[in-house]
């Protein structure tokens, strides 16, 4: 799909870029990790939102101290962001939300981002929507119609941006959304992407054929 679209394919996730590269190996795509707090463009240049070491350390200490009171909850430190997971301890959702809100009150440069069984604390102004906006201002994405697929609450900011740009926003699975389209699950996503890839490849082949015929007529 990346080849058929001349490289205009990016992975945008709450995961770190290191994790995304490991998942996509051996391929190397433009990426936006940690909800846009870190991004790599088509040329390999990285764009990172840095959190001062002292602030990152103080937040980490507070979170580690408090989360120990909630068995089953997990803290994931991402450098400039922190994720409080409660999939294995849903009874602690309210307590962890309160904890995250307290952190953002102490450090107003941080913001909350809710997801599926997780609440994240990230630098204010970062989102998947902002990452899409940045990509759409750069080659090879500029001038194209964006298509964005996602299955989480954190993807809603991306859907909003894509809708505003006149693109195609696709929600995977159930749940309220501002996406314009919906696919039931991962198997449907694979089928849809394969269909798009085939269509793009055929278009490229047709263009080559047209170019060859035009050249032949000119000699």
In which residue ranges do the predicted regions lie?
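Substrate-recognition "cap/lid" segment bordering the active-site pocket of phosphatases
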Residues: 34, 40-61, 113-144
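Mg2+-dependent phosphoryl-transfer enzymes with acidic/Ser/Thr/Gly-rich catalytic loops
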Residues: 124, 129-219
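Active-site phosphate-binding/coordination module
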Residues: 1-78
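Charged, glycine-interspersed solvent-exposed loop segments at helix/strand-loop junctions
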Residues: 73-90, 111-122
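Short amphipathic alpha-helices in soluble, non-transmembrane regions
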Residues: 59-63, 95-105
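Short, conserved charged micro-motifs
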Residues: 55, 91-96
């Amino acid at each position: 799909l990346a080849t058929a679209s001349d490289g205009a394919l990016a992975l945008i996730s709450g995961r770190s870029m290191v994790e995304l590269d490991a998942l996509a190996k051996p391929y190397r795509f433009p990426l936006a990790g940690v909800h846009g707090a870190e991004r790599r463009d088509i040329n390999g240049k990285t764009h990172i939102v840095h959190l001062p070491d002292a602030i990152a350390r103080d937040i980490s200490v507070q979170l580690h101290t408090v989360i120990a009171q909630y068995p089953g909850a997990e803290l994931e430190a991402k450098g400039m962001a922190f994720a409080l997971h409660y999939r294995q301890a849903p009874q602690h959702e309210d307590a962890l939300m309160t904890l995250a809100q307290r952190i953002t009150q102490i450090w107003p440069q941080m913001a909350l981002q809710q997801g599926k069984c997780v609440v994240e604390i990230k630098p204010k102004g970062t989102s998947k929507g902002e990452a899409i906006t940045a990509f759409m201002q750069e080659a090879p994405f500029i001038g194209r119609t964006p298509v964005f697929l996602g299955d989480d609450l954190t993807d809603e900011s991306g859907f909003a941006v894509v809708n505003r740009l006149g693109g195609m926003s696709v929600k995977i699975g159930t749940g309220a959304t501002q996406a314009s389209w919906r696919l039931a699950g991962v198997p449907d996503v694979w089928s849809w992407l394969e269909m798009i890839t085939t269509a793009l490849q055929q278009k490229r082949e047709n263009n080559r054929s047209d170019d060859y015929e035009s050249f032949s007529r000119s000699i």
